[in-house]
From Swiss-Prot:
Keywords: ATP-binding, Magnesium, Manganese, Metal-binding, Nucleotide-binding, Nucleotidyltransferase, Transferase. Belongs to the SELO family. ATP binds at G91, G93, R94, K114, D126, G127, R177, R184, D263. This is Protein nucleotidyltransferase YdiU. Its cofactor is Mg(2+); Mn(2+). The gene is ydiU. It is an enzyme of class 2 (transferase). InterPro entries: SelO. The active site is at D253. The keyword Membrane does not apply. Pfam families: SelO. GO terms for molecular function: AMPylase activity; ATP binding; magnesium ion binding. Its EC number is 2.7.7.-, 2.7.7.108. NCBIfam families: PRK00029.1.
C-alpha cells in the first residue's frame, strides 16, 4: 500500500491475491487531451482525497488513464453472466480497476476507470465510452445515493478529446467509478464454469474477508455468504421498488455481492405507476420490467447458489438442498422489506391486515388511473390532494377516508405519521426528461449549468423545498414513451 500525501491516494491491490485467472493486468490506453468536466467534491473528501489537488493537470491525467497514482495496479476483471437469460463468459471490456483506496477511517473502495480502452475481454468493442452515458451514470448514481439506496458512486468525469463511434460520432469520456467492490454474481459463475473448486473457494474466502468478515468463523461460511447476499439483495430490490427505480439490465454480471446498485446504462425512474413499465430499448420482452424485478433478482441469486454448490456441502444432493432452501427465503425477505417500506410511505405504524389492504387498494387505483408514482405519495405526504383523475375518483375518496381513519386510530400522532412519510417519500427523483435536458445541454452545448442545478436539487430528495418544485412536474405527453439505451 502506497500513500501519496498531497492528493491523498492510498492504494492497495488485494484483488491481485486471487488466482490470476480472475483478472488480466493491463494499462489504460492514453487519450489525446483530457479535460475534467465533473468532480464529486464530497465523495473525494470521504475517500481521503483533496479536491483542489484532483483538479490539477497531473491528477486529471490519472482520471483519463494517461498516468497512474502511486501504488496503482491496473487490471481488468474476468467474470461471466446470464445476459437476458443467455450465459456468456465476459469481463471488463472497457473498464480497469486501478486499485483500492483505503480511506482515513479504514474503509476500502475500488477505484475503476470506465471507458479506459480495450481489454482482452472487449469482444470487438473499442473499450471507450461516450460523454452522455457517463454523465448519466454520474447523475443517477448520485441521486440513488441521496435516496439512501446502496450504490456505486461517481468520483469524476473527464472528456478525452477523442470521438467515440456508436450509431453516430459522439464525444468520448471516462468515468471514475467508486464501489465497495466489483465482485458480481457473474464472478462466481465464472469461477464455477472454469471448474476449479480451489479457485471458487479462493473467491468465496476473499469475498467473505472483504464484505462479510463477521461470518468467517461460521460453521458453514459459504452457506452464510449466500444468506448474507440474499439478505442484502432483498433489501436493495425493495428499495428500488419503493422509489420506482427500474434498472433495465438485471443480468447476473450486474448483481453485486456487496448489495450495491451497479451499471446505470438503460435505467430510469417510473412516472405513471404501471407494473409493466419498461424503458430499455433492448428489453423487448419486458424481462426486466418494474414488476418483474423481484422475480429476476431471485432468479439471479439462484445462479449464485448454483455456482456455490461445489463448496456448500461435500454431498451434492445436500448442497443442492441447502441452495434451494436459502433461495426460497428471498421472496419472504423481500416482501417483508417492501411492506415495511410501503407502510412508512403511508404513515402506518402497525402491522395489521388493514395496512396490507390500504396499500394494495391504493396501488390498484394508481395503476387504473395512470397516476404519477412519486407525486401521488408526495401529495399524500403534504396532504395536498390535487385535481388528478385518481384523486377525483369516488374510490379514492373512499380510500382516503379509511386511510385518515386509520391514522387517527394509531397510538402515534398524525404529526409523527406525516413526518415518517416525509422521510420515506422523495419529493424529487431524477425525472427522465430532466436528465435528458441536462445531458443535451452538456453534450451538445458544453453547458454544465443545467446538470449542476439538477444535481443540487437531487442531493436532498426529502427536503420538500420550494426550489425543487420545477423538478416535480411529470413529463409532457410529447416526452413519452421514454426509451433508454445501454451506451456500450
Amino acid at each position: 500500500m502506497t500513500k501519496n500525501n498531497e492528493t491523498g491516494w492510498n492504494l492497495d491491490n488485494s484483488y491481485t491475491t486471487l488466482p490470476q485467472s480472475f483478472y488480466t493486468e493491463i494499462p489504460p490506453t492514453p487519450v489525446s487531451s483530457p479535460e475534467l468536466v465533473k468532480l464529486n467534491h464530497s465523495l473525494a473528501i470521504s475517500l481521503g482525497l483533496t479536491p483542489e489537488e484532483l483538479k490539477k493537470e497531473a491528477e486529471i491525467a490519472i482520471f483519463a488513464g494517461n498516468a497512474l497514482p502511486e501504488g496503482a495496479h491496473p487490471l481488468a476483471q474476468a467474470y461471466a453472466g446470464h445476459q437476458f437469460g443467455h450465459f456468456n463468459m465476459l469481463g471488463d471490456g472497457r473498464a480497469l480497476l486501478i486499485g483500492e483506496q483505503i480511506t482515513p477511517s479504514g474503509e476500502r473502495f475500488d477505484i475503476q476507470l470506465k471507458g479506459s480502452g480495450p481489454t482482452p475481454y472487449s469482444r470487438r468493442g473499442d473499450g471507450r465510452a461516450a460523454l452522455g452515458p457517463m454523465l448519466r451514470e454520474y447523475i443517477i448514481s448520485e441521486a440513488m445515493y441521496a435516496l439512501d439506496i446502496p450504490t456505486t458512486r461517481s468520483l469524476a468525469v473527464v472528456t478525452t478529446g477523442e470521438p467515440t463511434y456508436r450509431e453516430t460520432k459522439l464525444p468520448g469520456a471516462i468515468l471514475t467509478r467508486v464501489a465497495s467492490s466489483h465482485i458480481r454474481v457473474g464472478t462466481f459463475q465464472y469461477a464455477a464454469a472454469r471448474g476449479s473448486i480451489e479457485d471458487l473457494k479462493s473467491l468465496a474466502d476473499y469475498t467473505i474477508k472483504r464484505h462479510y468478515p463477521e461470518i468467517e468463523s461460521h460453521e458453514n461460511q459459504y452457506t452464510a455468504l449466500l444468506q448474507e447476499v440474499i439478505k442484502r439483495q432483498a433489501s436493495l430490490i425493495a428499495k428500488w421498488q419503493l422509489v420506482g427505480f427500474i434498472h433495465g439490465v438485471m443480468n447476473t454480471d450486474n448483481i453485486t455481492i456487496s448489495g450495491e446498485t451497479i451499471d446505470y446504462g438503460p435505467c430510469a425512474f417510473m412516472d405513471n405507476y404501471d407494473q409493466g413499465t419498461v424503458f430499455s430499448s433492448i428489453d423487448t420482452q419486458g424481462r426486466y420490467a418494474y414488476g418483474n424485478q423481484p422475480y429476476m433478482a431471485a432468479w439471479d441469486l439462484a445462479r449464485l447458489a448454483e455456482s456455490l454448490i461445489p463448496i456448500l456441502h461435500e454431498d451434492e444432493e445436500e448442497a443442492l438442498k441447502i441452495a434451494q432452501d436459502e433461495i426460497s427465503k428471498f421472496s419472504v425477505q423481500y416482501e417483508k422489506q417492501w411492506f415495511l417500506g410501503m407502510k412508512k410511505k403511508l404513515g402506518l405504524f402497525s402491522n395489521e391486515e388493514q395496512a396490507h389492504s390500504l396499500i394494495e387498494q391504493l396501488l390498484k387505483m394508481m395503476e387504473k388511473y395512470k397516476a404519477d408514482y412519486t407525486n401521488t405519495f408526495r401529495s399524500l405526504t403534504l396532504d395536498a390532494i390535487e385535481n388528478t383523475a385518481l384523486f377525483e375518483s369516488p374510490e379514492f375518496k373512499e380510500w382516503y377516508k379509511l386511510w385518515q381513519s386509520r391514522l387517527d386510530r394509531q397510538e402515534q400522532s398524525k404529526e409523527n405519521a406525516y413526518e415518517m412519510m416525509k422521510n420515506n417519500n422523495p419529493s424529487i427523483i431524477p425525472r427522465n426528461h430532466r436528465v435528458e435536458e441536462a445531458l443535451e445541454a452538456a453534450v451538445t452545448n458544453d453547458d454544465y449549468s443545467v446538470m449542476e442545478k439538477l444535481l443540487e436539487a437531487l442531493s436532498n430528495p426529502y427536503a420538500y423545498s420550494t426550489d425543487q418544485e420545477e423538478y416535480c412536474i411529470p413529463p409532457a405527453p410529447t416526452n413519452r414513451p421514454y426509451r433508454t439505451f445501454c451506451g456500450t
